[in-house]
From Swiss-Prot:
Source organism of this protein record: Bos taurus
SMART domains: TAFII55_N
Protein name: Transcription initiation factor TFIID subunit 7
Keyword Transcription: yes
Biased composition (Acidic residues): 230-247
InterPro entries named among the record's database cross-references: TAF7, TAFII55_prot_cons_reg
GO BP terms in the entry: regulation of transcription by RNA polymerase II; RNA polymerase II preinitiation complex assembly
Top-rank taxon: Eukaryota
Main localisation: nucleus
Keywords, alphabetical: Coiled coil, Nucleus, Phosphoprotein, Transcription, Transcription regulation, Ubl conjugation
Encoding gene per record: TAF7
Subcellular location(s) of the protein: Nucleus
Coiled-coil regions listed: 244-349
Length: 349
């Protein structure tokens, strides 16, 4: 059939959600599902003239009801064959019924006020009493406050001092006979920063030179002691022989000092190498401890899982995995013990 132009559009039904206490809700649900003809006798809704309060009777038991506005609009659908759904209404209100409520609440008489702002504010406060902050499901608790928060307004900050300073600068620029400007490139700033960093390097070199000078002073003292002792022993000999002996002792001392310096450098390098080895082995030990702890935790979880499983085939499979974890744990323990022995041997040296 073709729809004629004169046909009026289908109007949606007017619907709302009825929320009852649990014991009464189960009674109404069973009555609706059973399809009783006398459902009107068992359930009745009566609204007061204010349109917000009313009485809901379930099996002749009166319940106080209040009509509230939901935070959002929901669509109500119906179906005949459970395959195709048709929209029947937009639901935006809910009738909340309680046992301990007031069946006949006092009616608020309107007070005539000359100020329109005051009356407007009073109407707004009255509407807030019938605003429902929650949704229909539990995750939508306080949804009105969470999703409809008031946005922060940008406040205009008055700064008369800044405006006066800007005006003064503009007036001085206009009165100036000539102007001069200077451009500072980024490369120059980087060079100055590098120079500031290079200034600290002479201090480091001076520290090293001071350390070397202390070593040379000690060597000079040793040299002076040895030379003085050699002079005391050779007092009876001739002056020429003394000069020759002094020259020989100086050369020998220089060789000895050079050998000592070389030995100290080699010892320092060996110590540095040993420290690096110790740090590397310590790092390996820490990593191995972490792996061992992780393997032990996995084995513990596997044991708990085997205790809970009743299927024999599944339990055998889990047991095979547990055996592999135990073998892995033994290997990691051996590696950890070997690393600890190696570390102890290095520390003893």
């Amino acid at each position: 059939m073709s729809k004629s132009k004169d046909d009026a559009p289908h109007e949606l039904e007017s619907q709302f959600i009825l929320r009852l206490p649990p014991e009464y809700a189960s009674t109404v649900r069973r009555a609706v599902q059973s399809g009783h003809v006398n459902l009107k006798d068992r359930l009745s809704i009566e609204l007061h003239p204010d349109g917000r309060h009313g009485i809901v009777r379930v099996d002749r038991v009166p319940l106080a009801a209040k009509l509230v506005d939901l935070p959002r609009v929901m669509e109500s659908l119906k179906t005949i064959d459970k395959k195709t759904f048709y929209k029947t209404a937009d639901v935006c209100q809910m009738l909340v019924s309680t046992v301990d409520g007031d069946l006949y609440p006092p009616v608020e008489e309107p007070v005539a006020t000359a100020d329109p702002k005051a009356s407007k504010k009073k109407d707004k406060d009255k509407e807030k009493k019938f605003v429902w902050n929650h949704g229909i499901t539990l995750p939508l608790k306080n949804v009105r406050k969470r999703r409809f928060r008031k946005t922060a307004k940008k406040k205009y900050i008055e700064s008369p001092d800044v405006e006066k300073e800007v005006k003064r600068l503009l007036s001085t620029d206009a009165e100036a006979v000539s102007t001069r400007w200077e451009i500072i490139a980024e490369d120059e700033t980087k060079e100055t920063e590098n120079q500031g960093l290079d200034i600290s390097s002479p201090g480091m070199s001076g520290h090293r030179q001071g350390h070397d000078s202390l070593e040379h002073d000690e060597l000079r003292e040793i040299f002076n002691d040895l030379s003085s002792s050699s002079e005391d022993e050779d007092e009876t000999q001739h002056q020429d022989e003394e000069d020759i002996n002094i020259i020989d002792t100086e050369e020998d001392l220089e060789r000895q000092l050079q050998d000592k310096l070389n030995e100290s450098d080699e010892q320092h390098q060996e110590n540095e190498g040993t420290n690096q080895l110790v740090m590397g082995i310590q790092k390996q030990i820490d990593n191995m401890k972490g792996k061992l702890q992780e393997t032990q935790d996995r084995a513990k979880r596997q044991e708990d899982l085997i205790m809970k499983v009743e299927n024999l085939a599944l339990k055998n499979r889990f047991q095979a995995v547990l055996d592999e974890l135990k073998q892995k744990e033994d290997r990691e323990k051996e590696q950890l013990s070997s690393l600890q022995e190696e570390l102890e041997s290095l520390l003893e040296k």
